[in-house]
Every structure is written in structure tokens, then in C-alpha cells.
């Protein structure tokens, strides 16, 4: 039932309007009166259903019966049917407008509507204060509502009633009521109120009694008037003359014991007055009168005086025994009453009462120490002794309420059967019904308590606050936290000093994400009641629920040991254990595992027999689990569940240890078993906490494996059931962050911070999300809020370091990491947290030891592979649940004044949960991980982008996903080292050798480089300077024409050197018969002689001799007339172009027929040579002779160069820039460098962009340039200028990447070329252990060059430049390090298939003249026989498909703390060459802290290599 539903009845009770009745407008018949009483009875019993039936019967007799209309309207209001209640009021006002029933209903409806109809807040406060008995406050609020005016008629009555209760307002109240009576003399409400007020003071009490006696005879207000009449008689300081007043009351109520006793006292006074005085008798009389007046000290004094005179006087013994009874000194009472009863039987009942109450007292003591069985036995014995005494039944009901609400209700009902107004029974039922949701019945019973009994049991405020508190629990069960908060706040107003109400409210604030409000509620309690054990206990409970074990311990330590209950003692011991666990975790975090285990071992010893307590045993087992000693934790935890049927409590304890030990498989099974059990609400709360923590851990594990979808599926039931759960919302935010949705993640963190603005974990997480969006300003704002709260927190300081590191501010990150280490050291230096010395238990704590600055440098104790994230291993939300106490949410049944309200009824766990199944454990802690630890997975994406270069096209190196950096056992120290490794100054030097196969002087390459590198931290970045002496050598170019013609100026230069070396080809040509014919000079004797010799050789001349009868002269004459000789005699052939001669001769059959065998072919060869055809025979001979004369037959064309490269590089976070030159001293020198940026999109995606100008190092020509000594021409020194974009996605298990590149290649006297490249790859992390990592994948590379410039002639670049290239490779990366972590290595291997094709390309793409000369020279070379056949001076097209492979291995050894020796070997056949490379280097780190073996060998690479 809602608080507002009961408010009108509280108000009516305060006004006592429920007791008012005006004169009836009609006479009731006896049947009607019987039905009215029956309806009221059922209403008082909380059975509104039966009351409604009765009142409806009344309306069947009389449709306007006022009591029936009022009763049904009250039920309507209680059940929220306000409109129905108003209809009944209209009917009542129409039939009986002046009746008390109508007035009462108007007040009830008005009070109810006030909460929603804008009632004056002063009036509302006045009524609330009056109902709580705070009359001074109520009067002030009324007067504020009246604004200085007289009270209005509708409020005057309630105002004067409140005013009468104030110390100075009684007279004004009396006078005001008299004025009301004079203005409305027939109003029974005013008459009753005035009579009551008169009875409050002794001078007017008899007048009030007379008026109340008269009013008691009325049918309408008789009941309340009689109650007030009785109370006034008990208050009256009566004399013998007042006996008739008591006789008049007893005439109507003869069985009233107290009034009868009061009359007996008056009669005794009369007897005493007429009997001679007996001193002892007088003393006895005075003693009994004092006892009757509850003046126990006076009574004790009188009875003691009598016993001094008559030691065995039964009356004195009985009287003093009665005093001891009232003093609750029941054992002494028995000793006194036993002889009294023996002397006078009338004291037997008192003796039994003493025994009875002593047994109940002993039962309460047993219950307080937790011995419920003994308590039950004692209570049952007491009930058997006095079965009609209700207190025993109430005590039994209190004991049963926690586990058997049905039996408890029966016990309370038995008590009420013996005393219908018994406060304990009524209060017990109120609490029981409230917890069962029967709030209407609880409220009805609450209203039944008379004022005197309410005062006896603690007052109306206590009872009302208990109902409000129980109603708050009901609202919480229904998910209505707002109404629950309203009820608890109202309860706190009623009883501001009640520690348990404040604790309930503080818990509600805590759950609502308002820890500051929760703390304020408890601080308000401690400010007033800071020395009360209950207040300190409640404060300790809130502290432990918040994870503040230090605060819990300190609160409990302020309670004197003698005042601690068993629950307090147990909680204090548990808090101490948890503090030891925290210290152990700090030691483990610093890599001091041995010290942590020693600390807990001493804790075991110190606890001794206390480990028989399951709560302490579970706490200690959890501490071992936190320290990483899972085996010891499980051994201890097994003791909780030994036996055939472990208790639910012990199984919950066991589950909490499994949670802390990360034994998820077994934990899942235990939780499923518990789901089918019946638990108390407190046990169910803890079960739900364990279940949620387990589920959230699986969510995080799935997230860190990259299975975001599965993680959300596991999380969604928790979000649905607990939408306000901070840990569930934080898990959802982490899912968004993992998906790269940092904006959404930050929005969730902001929602959490609206409710919990001081939540450190959320503040640091929000800072990370803001930093991930490059919003450093917001990130810093969150960090400053966190640091303002916890400036010495190592976690917060480390989080700040991580944020600044991610933002590239390494210097600032280093400062925070150093501060975090210092904070850790301060904490570790106080291992006992100040708990040692005189406190016993904490004396076992080990003393702290300063942080070892050399920790981890030469190898730390091996640690188990991390199964879950650092957050899960260290605690946070999961361990908060696991370490939460299991018996310290103080059940209200243990709290004085609230015992009956708070009784917990058992609940079935399965009934309280949805049908959603628990997620399966993602991985068991006992199975070695074959996957990377989550922290490594996130780190692995950094630096994972494959390098892209126009000159380095080997398969993408997926090996960048390397092992995590060497661990020291302290994550903060590791991160500081990582930052220092980036910031530290360093020197490195080494030698690199690279060899490519190829032709000497052309494609062959031997490259030796000796880089010396120095790096210095500058601001937030790092500046590097490199000097690289370099030697390149391609060997000596061969002098044979076939080789020499493919270098420099090509065939033209090559043919001269070939002829100079050997003139035979010239002589052979010039001396050939056909060439001699062509060298004739017309009709000369020399010509005729050459013709004769030629004809003689061909046989023509012999034929002419025969024809001319062997006449030589005739034959010579005839020869001159032959076609060919006649043609040659007719022209000067030596000065005629060979081409023209060839056309004339070969084009005339008559002429060509006279050529000798083979001479026609020779002539055709001459004519086919472009160089020869255009020259005359004389000119060609001269040309050839000149070539031979100008050539150098012994020329050696060595291709080598030396120089020193210089370079400067700056890096700051993701930004990098470099500027340098190719080696100075090379023939061609170029400025090179680049600007790049590397960024991240979430935790799984990284990207980079670079604009660069790089040297192309494929050959001596492309790298250093070349000069053709034959022609003096220089060319080469190629650079590749362009843009590259890369992206990598890696979820820790699978990854993929894509690279795009576009470059223009340019060189001195080299044709420009454009290059485009695309790389795509996919890989899987196949193995990830503490010391090894194995990654395998597939890579596809495609690229194109516009031109084929792979040649070495003038205008070519000497670099591989296919027009199409495709490589499909299957790379594997294996990296690792030794167990001692002094040597690391990485091996990369790939095998695949490559295909490329090149188009034909002229020897001289930039110079047509040279190209033409090359054609001429090539034809002459063929003509002269320098080559087997003529070949065009063009590089032929090519298409090739084959196997590609790549094998690379690197290792690094830490030979000294700051000195590293490393090397690498590489073999590959990628592209169109085979290559081998090796290097050896030394690396020295200036900063000792930053000198740690990295996650992979830091190979000193060539500044000109693509990987640089």
C-alpha cells in the first residue's frame, strides 16, 4: 500500500476524528448496530473483503446508512479508488450532512488529495508533525499556514488539539475549544476534544472526567470518550473522595484491572485511616503504593526496611520480588518470590511470571549470539509455563518469522487471542504482512494499536516508521524505487536516530547512483549518535557494501569490545581479512608475489580457530584467490561445502570464492544449482549479485575475444532485469568502445556519472573514451575530477598516464606513471594499514619494502598466463560482488524496535529470475590460453600496419602483431618502461649487408651500410639523427658488345670498343668480294682489274675465254659489255650510297644474276643496315675505321660508389617527419624524407597516411646513379614521391589490412614513371602464450607501373617496374622470447605464387637520337658479325609466373642492463631477383628504466629501406 494511501488515516488518528461521532440522525436498531460492529471488527482485523460484505448488507437495509458509507469509502481510498470514495461522500453529505461520519470522510479525502492537489506545505508539515507527536513543530506549521490570522473553522479543531500538547499552549487551546463549543454547542467532535484537553491538567481533570463520563454514554462517541475517561482516571491524583468516580467507571467496565487497583488503593487508604498504625504494615502499604505508582526505588526501600525487621515476611518478599520483576532482574525476583509463594500462595503467579520472563530473557541472549535452537527451546518452555501470556507467543513468532512465516503468523495470532491489543503481536504481524505484500492488513493492524500501547512499545513514530520501512521494501520488490525512497525519507523524519532506517535509505541512494547522498545520510546519524554501537554498525555495513573495508573496520573498531555483538565481531574480522587481501593484491601488482603469499599465510595462522566461521573462511579463501594462489583458495573453499547437504548460505559463500578465483565453469554449475533453491530475500540479493558478476565477466571476456555480438547477447538480460545496474551499463559502454563507438560509450559513462558523479572507474573510463575521440580537453576534465577525489590513487594516476600516452603526450604520461608508482610504494610501505600493534590480528602483517628499481630487468618469477583482463584479475565490479559480506546486511529482525517489520520471508530464486540462462563460461581459468591476453590484443594493433613502399613489394609483414612487452609483474611499471622506451635517449650502430644477384655492372648489387643512430627526447617527441656510410657495388661491366650495348649510351658506344679490341670484322667486310666491287671508281684500269678478278672467281671470265677462242683481249672486251661490269664501269660506285647500288643491282635480274654465290645476300645485308645503306662504300669503310680508332678495347666500366647519408627524424605520438639525403658522395644525391600520421579508430582499427620522397635502392643505378665513361653521360638516382594510405583491423583473434599507394618515380635523365599498388591481407592469431606468438594469414599484392624502366641504358632507372604484378602469398609470423626474457626473436616466412609482365621498352626512352643511333649500331653489329643476329635496341616484353618465397629471422640479446646485441638474416626471391641480406647491431639505452627487452627485436634497419 502506498504511503499516500495511509496518510488520511494517520491524519484521522492524529485528529482522533475516527473517534468522533455526532448525534445520529436516526435511531439504530439492534440489528443495524450489530452489523456496524461486525463491519468495524473485520475492518480492524484487516479483512476488508468481509468488512465490505457486511457494510453492503447494511446498505441493503438502509441505502444511506452512514457507517456503511464511511467504511466502504475508507476501503475505496485504501485501494486507490478515490472517485468512488467521493461518490460515497456526496451520498453521505446528501443524507447526513452534519454527521461525524461525513466530517470524518471529508477530512480523509481532503488529506489524501492534498498530496496531489497542491495542499499548503505548511499544513502538510503540521499534520505530519502532529501525527508524530511533535506538537510544538505542528503548532508552528499551523500558524505559518494561517499567516497570522485566526484558524479557519475547518482547521481550528485540529490546530487546538495540537496546541494543547505544547508546553505553553494548553490554556490557549482550552479557550479556543470553548469558543468553538459556544459557537457550535451540538458538535460532538468539539465536545470530546474540549473534555480531553481538560483532562490533560490536574486542576481541570475532574471537570474533564465529568464531561467524558457524559459523552461515554452516547452511541456515536461513546467508545473514544470511554478510553479518554479511563486514561484521565489513571492520571488523576485521587483521594478518598474520588472513589465514586472510579466506581462509576467500573459499573460499565468491571474487569478493568488498573482502574480496580486504583480504587483498591483508595479503600486501603480509608482502612488505614481507621486502623491503629503498624510500622511494618505502614511500610508495606507505602511500598505497595509506590510499586503501584511505579516508583520502584521508594518501593524497594520500604520492602527492604520490612525485611530487616521480618526477614521471612512473605508480603515484603513478594513486594521486593515484584520490584525485581519490574526491574527485569528475573533471577533475583525468583529468589525472593520462591519463599514468598511458599508463605502465601498468592505470590505463586508472580513466581511463575519471574521464571517465564527469565526464560524469555535467556532466549533473547541465545538468539543474539546466534544459537537459534537454544533460543527456541527456552521460548517453548516459557510458553508451556504460562500459555496464556502473549509475550512468549510473540517471542516465538519473532524467532519463526525469519524462516517460517506461516508459523510466525499463527504465534502472533495466539498472542492476540490472549491480548487483542498486544503491541508486540500487532507489530509482528504488521512486519510480517508488510513483507508479504499484505499492506492493507498491516495498516489496519497498525491502526488498532491504542495510544498507550504505542507509547509502551516505542511510540507511534516507531510503529509508523516500521510500516513505512516495510512498505518501502514492497515498493522496491515492485521496482518502484522512487516510492520506496519517499517512504524511507518519511520514516527517517519520524525516527531520525534510527540507524537501520538510515541504512536502508543510504543503500537506496547508493543503488540509485547517489553515493554522496548515501554518505550524507549516514554522516547525519554519526554526527548525533556517533558513539552508539548500532550507528557504527550500520555505518560499517554501508562501508563494506561500498567496498570500503577500511571504513568498515574503523567504524567497528570504535565499538568497545564488550559492546560488540557476534555479527559486529564477525564483520570486523572479515574487514580485517579483506584489508589483508587488498595489501596482498597490491604486492602482486608490483610483482612481489612471494611477499603476498607470506602475508596471507600469516593471516591464516593469526585467524586460527576462527576459520571455523564460514564467513571468515570464505573471506580468507577469496583473499588467496585475489593474490593469485588459486589452489589454496579452492582448498579453503572446499571446506564450506563438505558434507552431504551444504547449507544455502555456505554454497553462496563457496560461489563467491569461485568468482574471485575465476573458476567460471564450476561457478556456473553452482549458480544453476542454487537457482532451484528457496532463499531468504537477503540470500537472493547476494545470489543475484553473484549471477550478475559472473555474467558481466563473460561479457567482458567475449568482448576481449572480439565477439561483440555474443557479448551483447549475454549482457542484454542483465540490462533488461537491472536497467540501472552501474556495472552492466559500464560493460555496455566497453562494448561500444570496442566497436569503435567511443561517442556512444562516452554517452553511457556520462549517464552513469549523472547518478554517480564521484565514481572513479567511470571517470577514468570516460576520460579514455574522450581521448579516443581526440577530445583531450574533455579527457583532462574527467581526469581532474577523478584526481580531485583520489589524488593519491595509483589506479587513477595510472589511468591519467594512459590517457596522455594515447594522446601522444609521453612526457606527461611519464610523470603520471611515476606518480602512480610512488603511490604504490607508499601503500606497500603500510602493509598493516595501521591495524597492527595492539589489535592482535593485524600484527601478522609483513612490513613494506621499497619498490625495487631493478625489478624485472633480469627476469622475474614466472607468472601464469593471464586468462582475463587486468580489470577482471584485479577486482573492480566482479570482486566487489565476490567480496561483499554475506551476513552483514543486518536483517531488520535483529534491530530493536523493528523486529517484527523486517522479518525475511523465503523466496525461490528461480521464481525471481527471468528464464534467461546463464551464459556459458568463455574459458576456464585452469586451461592455458591459446589466445592473446586482452591487454595484449588491444596493444597488438599499435604499429601493426604493414609498410608500403614503391620499391619494397614483398608480401605484407603481418608479423607486427607481436608479443606483449616483457612484464615485470607490475603493470604500471611496465607502462612506465614502455613510455620510457619511447622517450629514452639511445645510441645504436651496426653493419648491414645486402646482395642481389644479376649481371655484373648491371643488375647485380652489393650494398654495405654502417648506420650510426642517436635519438634524443625533445618535448613530447623524439628527435633522431643518423649518419650512414654506404658502399654500393654492381661489379664491372663486360666489354663484349652483347653486354656493353645494354648500358649507358648502348650499342653506339659498345660497337666502337668492340672494333677497337678486334678489327677483324672491319677487314672481313671491306675485303669481301662484293664490297670490293662496290668500292670501284668507274671505268678505270683498277676497276677493270677488279671486275676481271671477280669474273674469274665467279667463272664468267673463263666462259668468255672459251667463247672467244681463249683470247684474253676478246674476253676482256666481252666482259666489259656484260651487264654488271658495264654498270659498274658506268658509275663511280665508291661514291654512290650503298643503298642505291643495292637497289640498282638487286633490282635488275641481269645484274644480280652475275653476282657470285652469297654475294647477293651480303649486298642485301649491307642494304639492310640503315647505317651502311646511307653511306658510300668508301664512307662506310672510313666510318668503321674511325670507330675502331676511337674505341677502347681495354676499357673497364666498374659500377660502384661510396658516400655518407645523413638524416634527421622527429616522432611525436602518431606524427612523424623526417628529412635527409641519399649518401653524400654518390654521383646522384637527392633530398629524401616524409611526413606521416598514424591513428586509431576504436580499439580494433588503426590507420596511417604518409607523404614521402624515398630513394629507390634496387640497383646502383637507381640508388647512386651512373656515368657512361664511353660517352660521358650521367643518369640515375631515382626517387619515389607520393602518398600511401593504410588501415588495419584486429580484434585480437582475427585481423585484416588494406594498403593503397600511388607514387611518381623520377631521376636525373631518367624517364618519369607512375606507380600504383594495392595490398590486401587477412590473418589469424593462431597461438598466443606468455612467451610465444604465432600468426598466419594470406596476402595479396597487386601493382602497376606505367613504363618499363628496368633497363640500365641512358633514360632507364634500373628498378623493377612491371606493367602488371600479382603476388598471392601465405605469410607466417612467429615471435617469442626465452623464459628468462633476455633474448627475443621473430621469424617471418612466406611462400606463394607471383606473376608479372613487362612491356617492350626502347633503350633510350628520353632521347630519340640515341635510340636511332642504337638502331644503326645494332645493324652494324649484326653486319660485322659482332652478334649472331640482328636485334632491335629494345628491351623485350616479358611474362613470368613462378613460386615466390621469403624467409627472415631476427634476434636480440640483452647482454647488459642497457646494452642490446641483435641481428637479422633475410632470403627472398620476390620480383625478378634473388636477394640475401644480413645485419648486426649494438643498441645502448641511456635511461636504465627504459632499458627493457622490447616486445620484438628492434632491428637497426637501413634508413633507405622500406621498413624504416
Curated annotation (Swiss-Prot):
GO terms for biological process: cellulose biosynthetic process; UDP-alpha-D-glucose metabolic process. Belongs to the AcsC/BcsC family. GO terms for cellular component: outer membrane. This is Cellulose synthase operon protein C. The keyword Repeat applies. SUPFAM superfamilies: TPR-like (SSF48452). Coiled coil: none annotated. Keywords: Cellulose biosynthesis, Repeat, Signal, TPR repeat. TPR repeats lie at residues 32-65, 119-152, 314-347, 354-389, 391-422, 423-456, 499-532, 692-725, 726-759, 761-793, 794-827. It comes from the Bacteria. InterPro entries: BCSC_C (IPR008410), Cell_synth_C (IPR003921), TPR-like_helical_dom_sf (IPR011990), TPR_rpt (IPR019734). The gene is bcsC. The lineage of its organism: Bacteria, Pseudomonadati, Pseudomonadota, Gammaproteobacteria, Lysobacterales. It holds the Pfam family TPR_19. Required for maximal bacterial cellulose synthesis. Pathway: Glycan metabolism; bacterial cellulose biosynthesis. The keyword Iron does not apply. Residues 1-27 form the signal peptide.
Amino acid at each position: 500500500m502506498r504511503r499516500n494511501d495511509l496518510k488520511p488515516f494517520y491524519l484521522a488518528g492524529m485528529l482522533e476524528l475516527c473517534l468522533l461521532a455526532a448525534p445520529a440522525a436516526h435511531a439504530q436498531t439492534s440489528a443495524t448496530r450489530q452489523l456496524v460492529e461486525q463491519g468495524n471488527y473485520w475492518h480492524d482485523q484487516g479483512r476488508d473483503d468481509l468488512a465490505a460484505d457486511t457494510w453492503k448488507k447494511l446498505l441493503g437495509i438502509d441505502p444511506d446508512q452512514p457507517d456503511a458509507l464511511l467504511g466502504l469509502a475508507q476501503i475505496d481510498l485504501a485501494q486507490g479508488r478515490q472517485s468512488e470514495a467521493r461518490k460515497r461522500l456526496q451520498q453521505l453529505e446528501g443524507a447526513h450532512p452534519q454527521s461525524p461520519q461525513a466530517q470524518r470522510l471529508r477530512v480523509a479525502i481532503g488529506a489524501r488529495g492534498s498530496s496531489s492537489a497542491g495542499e499548503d506545505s505548511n499544513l502538510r508539515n503540521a499534520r505530519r508533525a502532529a501525527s508524530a507527536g511533535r506538537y510544538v513543530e505542528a503548532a508552528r506549521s499551523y500558524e505559518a499556514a494561517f499567516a497570522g490570522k485566526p484558524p479557519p473553522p475547518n482547521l481550528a479543531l485540529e490546530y487546538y488539539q495540537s496546541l494543547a500538547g505544547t508546553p505553553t499552549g494548553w490554556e490557549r487551546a482550552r479557550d479556543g475549544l470553548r469558543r468553538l463549543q459556544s459557537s457550535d454547542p451540538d458538535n460532538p467532535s468539539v465536545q470530546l476534544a474540549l473534555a480531553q484537553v481538560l483532562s490533560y491538567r490536574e486542576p481541570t481533570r475532574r471537570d474533564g472526567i465529568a464531561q467524558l463520563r457524559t459523552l461515554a454514554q452516547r452511541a456515536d462517541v461513546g467508545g473514544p470518550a470511554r478510553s479518554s475517561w479511563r486514561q484521565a482516571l489513571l492520571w488523576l491524583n485521587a483521594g478518598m473522595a474520588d472513589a465514586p468516580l472510579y466506581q462509576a467507571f467500573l459499573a460499565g467496565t468491571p474487569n478493568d484491572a488498573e482502574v480496580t487497583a486504583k480504587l483498591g488503593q483508595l479503600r486501603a487508604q480509608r482502612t488505614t485511616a481507621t486502623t491503629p498504625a503498624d510500622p511494618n504494615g505502614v511500610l508495606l502499604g507505602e511500598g505497595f503504593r509506590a510499586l503501584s505508582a511505579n516508583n520502584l526505588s521508594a518501593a524497594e526501600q520500604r520492602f527492604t526496611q520490612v525485611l530487616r525487621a521480618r526477614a521471612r515476611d512473605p508480603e515484603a518478599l513478594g513486594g521486593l520480588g515484584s520490584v525485581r520483576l519490574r526491574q527485569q532482574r528475573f533471577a533475583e525476583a525468583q529468589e525472593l518470590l520462591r519463599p514468598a509463594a511458599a508463605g502465601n500462595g498468592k505470590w505463586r503467579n508472580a513466581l511463575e511470571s519471574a521464571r517465564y520472563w527469565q526464560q524469555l530473557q535467556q532466549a533473547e541472549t541465545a538468539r543474539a549470539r546466534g544459537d537459534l535452537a537454544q533460543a527456541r527451546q527456552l521460548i517453548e518452555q516459557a510458553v508451556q509455563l504460562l500459555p496464556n501470556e502473549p509475550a512468549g507467543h510473540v517471542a516465538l513468532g519473532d524467532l519463526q518469522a525469519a524462516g517460517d512465516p506461516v508459523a510466525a503468523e499463527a504465534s502472533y495470532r495466539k498472542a492476540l487471542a490472549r491480548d487483542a491489543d498486544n503491541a508486540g503481536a500487532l507489530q509482528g504481524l504488521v512486519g510480517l504482512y508488510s513483507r508479504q505484500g499484505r499492506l492493507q492488513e498491516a495498516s489496519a493492524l497498525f491502526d488498532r494499536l491504542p495510544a498507550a500501547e504505542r507509547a509502551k512499545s516505542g511510540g507511534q513514530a516507531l510503529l509508523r516508521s516500521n510500516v513505512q520501512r516495510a512498505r518501502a521494501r514492497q515498493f522496491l520488490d515492485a521496482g518502484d524505487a522512487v516510492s520506496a525512497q519517499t517512504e524511507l525519507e518519511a520514516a527517517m523524519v519520524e525516527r531520525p536516530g534510527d540507524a537501520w532506517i538510515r541504512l536502508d535509505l543510504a543503500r537506496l541512494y547508493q543503488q540509485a547512483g547517489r553515493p554522496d547522498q548515501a554518505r550524507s545520510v549516514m554522516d547525519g546519524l554519526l554526527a548525533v549518535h556517533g558513539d552508539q554501537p548500532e550507528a557504527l554498525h550500520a555505518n560499517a555495513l554501508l562501508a563494506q557494501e561500498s567496498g570500503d573495508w577500511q571504513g568498515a573496520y574503523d567504524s567497528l573498531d570504535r565499538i568497545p569490545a564488550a559492546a560488540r555483538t557476534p555479527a559486529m565481531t564477525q564483520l570486523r574480522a572479515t574487514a580485517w581479512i579483506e584489508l589483508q587481501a587488498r595489501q596482498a593484491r597490491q604486492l602482486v601488482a608490483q610483482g612481489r608475489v612471494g611477499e603476498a603469499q607470506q602475508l596471507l599465510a600469516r593471516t591464516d595462522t593469526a585467524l586460527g580457530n576462527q576459520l571455523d566461521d564460514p564467513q571468515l573462511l570464505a573471506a580468507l579463501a577469496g583473499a588467496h584467490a585475489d593474490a593469485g594462489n588459486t589452489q589454496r583458495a579452492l582448498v579453503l573453499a572446499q571446506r564450506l561445502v563438505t558434507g552431504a547437504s551444504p547449507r544455502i548460505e555456505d554454497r553462496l559463500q563457496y560461489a563467491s570464492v569461485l568468482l574471485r578465483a575465476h573458476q567460471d565453469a564450476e561457478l556456473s554449475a553452482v549458480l544453476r544449482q542454487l537457482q532451484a533453491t528457496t532463499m531468504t530475500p537477503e540470500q537472493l540479493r547476494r545470489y543475484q549479485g553473484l549471477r550478475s558478476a559472473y555474467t558481466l565477466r563473460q561479457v567482458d571476456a567475449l568482448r576481449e575475444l572480439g565477439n561483440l555480438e555474443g557479448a551483447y547477447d549475454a549482457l542484454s538480460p542483465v540490462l533488461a532485469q537491472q536497467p540501472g545496474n552501474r556495472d552492466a551499463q559500464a560493460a555496455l559502454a566497453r562494448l561500444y568502445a570496442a566497436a569503435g563507438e567511443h561517442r556512444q560509450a562516452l554517452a553511457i559513462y556520462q549517464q552513469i556519472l549523472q547518478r554517480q558523479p564521484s565514481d572513479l572507474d567511470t571517470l577514468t573510463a570516460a576520460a579514455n573514451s574522450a581521448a579516443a575521440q581526440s577530445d583531450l580537453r574533455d579527457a583532462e576534465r574527467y581526469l581532474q575530477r577523478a584526481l580531485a577525489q583520489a589524488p593519491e590513487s595509483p589506479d587513477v594516476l595510472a589511468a591519467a598516464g594512459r590517457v596522455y600516452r594515447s594522446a601522444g603526450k609521453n612526457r606527461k604520461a611519464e610523470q603520471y606513471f611515476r606518480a602512480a608508482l610512488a603511490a604504490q610504494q607508499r601503500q606497500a610501505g603500510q602493509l598493516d594499514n595501521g591495524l597492527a600493534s595492539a589489535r592482535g590480528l593485524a600484527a601478522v602483517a609483513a612490513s613494506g619494502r621499497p619498490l625495487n628499481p631493478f625489478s624485472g630487468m633480469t627476469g622475474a618469477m614466472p607468472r601464469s598466463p593471464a586468462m582475463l583482463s587486468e580489470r577482471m584479475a584485479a577486482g573492480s565490479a566482479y570482486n566487489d560482488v565476490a567480496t561483499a559480506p554475506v551476513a552483514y546486511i543486518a536483517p531488520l529482525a535483529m534491530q530493536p524496535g523493528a523486529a517484527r517489520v523486517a522479518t525475511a520471508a523465503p523466496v525461490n530464486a528461480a521464481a525471481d529470475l527471468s528464464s534467461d540462462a546463464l551464459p556459458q563460461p568463455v574459458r576456464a581459468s585452469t586451461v592455458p590460453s591459446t589466445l592473446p591476453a586482452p591487454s595484449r590484443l588491444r596493444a597488438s594493433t599499435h604499429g601493426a600496419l604493414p609498410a608500403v613502399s614503391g620499391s619494397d613489394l614483398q608480401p605484407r609483414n603481418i608479423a607486427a602483431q607481436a608479443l606483449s612487452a616483457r612484464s615485470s609483474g607490475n603493470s604500471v611499471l611496465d607502462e612506465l618502461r614502455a613510455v620510457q622506451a619511447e622517450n629514452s635517449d639511445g645510441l645504436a650502430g651496426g653493419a648491414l649487408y645486402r646482395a642481389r644477384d644479376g649481371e655484373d655492372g648491371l643488375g647485380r648489387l652489393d650494398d654495405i651500410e654502417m648506420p650510426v643512430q642517436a635519438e634524443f627526447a625533445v618535448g613530447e617527441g623524439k628527435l633522431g639523427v643518423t649518419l650512414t656510410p654506404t658502399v654500393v657495388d654492381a661489379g664491372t661491366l663486360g666489354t663484349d658488345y652483347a653486354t656493353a650495348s645494354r648500358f649507358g649510351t648502348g650499342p653506339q658506344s659498345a660497337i666502337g670498343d668492340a672494333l677497337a679490341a678486334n678489327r677483324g670484322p672491319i677487314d672481313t667486310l671491306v675485303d669481301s668480294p662484293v664490297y670490293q666491287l662496290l668500292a670501284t671508281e668507274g671505268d678505270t684500269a683498277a676497276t677493270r682489274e677488279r671486275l676481271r678478278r671477280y669474273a674469274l672467281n665467279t667463272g664468267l671470265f673463263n666462259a668468255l675465254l672459251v667463247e672467244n677462242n681463249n683470247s684474253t683481249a676478246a674476253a676482256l672486251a666481252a666482259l666489259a659489255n656484260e651487264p654488271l661490269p658495264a654498270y659498274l664501269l658506268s658509275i663511280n660506285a665508291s661514291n654512290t650510297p650503298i643503298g642505291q647500288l643495292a637497289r640498282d643491282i638487286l633490282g635488275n635480274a641481269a645484274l644480280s644474276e652475275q653476282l657470285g654465290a652469297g654475294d647477293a645476300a651480303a649486298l642485301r645485308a649491307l642494304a639492310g643496315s640503315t647505317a651502311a645503306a646511307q653511306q658510300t662504300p668508301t664512307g662506310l669503310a672510313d666510318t668503321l675505321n674511325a670507330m675502331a680508332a676511337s674505341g677502347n678495347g681495354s676499357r673497364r666500366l666498374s659500377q660502384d660508389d661510396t658516400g655518407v647519408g645523413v638524416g634527421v627524424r622527429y616522432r611525436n605520438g602518431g606524427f612523424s617527419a623526417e628529412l635527409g639525403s641519399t649518401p653524400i658522395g654518390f654521383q646522384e644525391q637527392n633530398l629524401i624524407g616524409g611526413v606521416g600520421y598514424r591513428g586509431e579508430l576504436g580499439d580494433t582499427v588503426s590507420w596511417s597516411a604518409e607523404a614521402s620522397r624515398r630513394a629507390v635502392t634496387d640497383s646502383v643505378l637507381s640508388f647512386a646513379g651512373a656515368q657512361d665513361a664511353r660517352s660521358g653521360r650521367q643518369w640515375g638516382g631515382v626517387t619515389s614521391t607520393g602518398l600511401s594510405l593504410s588501415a588495419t583491423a584486429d580484434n585480437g583473434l582475427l585481423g585484416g589490412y588494406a594498403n593503397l599507394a600511388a607514387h611518381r618515380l623520377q631521376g636525373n635523365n631518367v624517364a618519369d614513371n607512375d606507380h600504383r599498388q594495392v595490398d590486401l591481407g587477412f590473418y589469424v592469431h593462431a597461438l598466443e602464450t606468455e612467451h610465444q606468438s604465432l600468426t598466419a594469414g594470406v596476402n595479396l599484392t597487386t601493382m602497376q607501373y606505367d613504363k618499363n624502366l628496368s633497363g640500365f641504358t641512358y633514360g632507364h632507372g634500373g628498378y623493377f617496374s612491371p606493367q602488371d604484378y600479382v603476388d598471392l602469398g601465405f605469410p607466417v609470423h612467429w615471435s617469442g622470447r626465452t623464459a628468462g626474457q633476455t633474448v627475443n626473436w621473430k621469424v617471418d616466412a612466406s611462400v606463394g605464387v607471383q606473376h608479372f609482365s613487362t612491356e617492350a621498352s626502347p633503350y633510350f626512352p628520353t632521347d630519340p637520337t640515341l635510340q636511332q643511333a642504337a638502331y644503326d649500331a645494332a645493324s652494324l653489329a649484326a653486319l660485322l658479325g659482332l652478334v649472331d643476329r640482328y636485334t632491335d635496341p629494345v628491351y623485350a616484353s616479358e611474362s613470368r609466373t613462378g613460386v615466390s618465397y621469403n624467409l627472415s629471422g631476427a634476434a636480440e640479446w640483452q647482454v647488459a642492463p642497457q646494452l642490446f646485441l641483435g641481428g637479422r638474416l633475410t632470403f627472398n626471391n620476390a620480383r625478378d631477383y634473388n636477394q640475401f641480406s644480413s645485419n648486426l647491431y649494438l643498441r645502448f639505452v641511456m635511461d636504465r628504466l627504459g632499458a627493457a627487452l622490447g616486445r620484438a627485436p628492434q632491428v637497426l634497419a637501413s634508413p633507405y629501406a622500406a621498413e624504416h
